[in-house]
Amino acid sequence: MAADLLDVHGLLFKRQQYKEADLLAKLWTKELGIVTVIAKGGMRPKSQLAAAVLPFTEGTFSILTRYKGISQLRTYKKLSQHDELFTDLDKNAYLSYLFDLADHAFSEYQKLGGYYDLLLVAFNRIVAGQDPEIIAQIVQLQLLDAFGVAPQLGACVICGKEKGIFDYSIAAGGVVCSDHFRSVSRLHLSPKATALIRTLALLPISRLGEIQIGEDLKKESRRAIAQIYQATVDLHLPSLRFLNEVRGS
């Protein structure tokens, strides 16, 4: 199969040295999904590709691709970089984890659909200074569908009731209303935490405004999401361990 020279727009979210002077990098792209590219000579100080392979560089990348395996980064046309991410440990930790999580939800060259914008909006919101914990929880909850384990959050799993007091049941695969609290095992969340999880899972991230959520409530919903992931996805990501160290949890 002949290789095509193609322009893709997206974000470089991961890189590692390959051999002596080359780099392997992962791109989150609108056109092709997740793509691993090799930047030949990218480690050399005078490399023309050096600027394009810095972590969290957004732009238009020209790649030589066969739509499988490793593509080759040839050049770039427009780049946007965020130098503050190199010194802001919190932002860096959150973003590294979110893209690592998304990287495990999709195969390479799999179309991302609306998840492309989900991660890009999350990236830009965190860079702009919005609460990274709330944004991370939105992404975590909405990526569950990409993993094939989307919970039912719009209504009670058992009776379909949409309003009232709810709790989350991992065994039932979603929320249960107070009428059925004794019917299934549940997480015993506060009503506010369950309401927050339902809201974050169903809210388009582009509609997220400036909101103030108490630290205790965020920690409760964070623990619940961690339990959901452990029971349904069961990933053990070093990036999550690092994030937990940074945020002290």
UniProtKB/Swiss-Prot annotation:
Keyword line: DNA damage, DNA recombination, DNA repair
Pfam families associated with the record: RecO_C, RecO_N
Gene Ontology cellular-component terms listed: bacterial nucleoid
Gene Ontology biological-process entries: DNA recombination; double-strand break repair
Origin: domain of life: Bacteria
InterPro entries given in the database record: ARFGAP/RecO, DNA_rep/recomb_RecO_N, NA-bd_OB-fold, RecO, RecO_C
Record NCBIfam families: reco
Family of the protein in this entry: Belongs to the RecO family.
HAMAP family given in the database record: RecO
Described purpose of this protein according to its UniProt entry: Involved in DNA repair and RecF pathway recombination.
Name the record gives this protein: DNA repair protein RecO
Encoding gene per record: recO
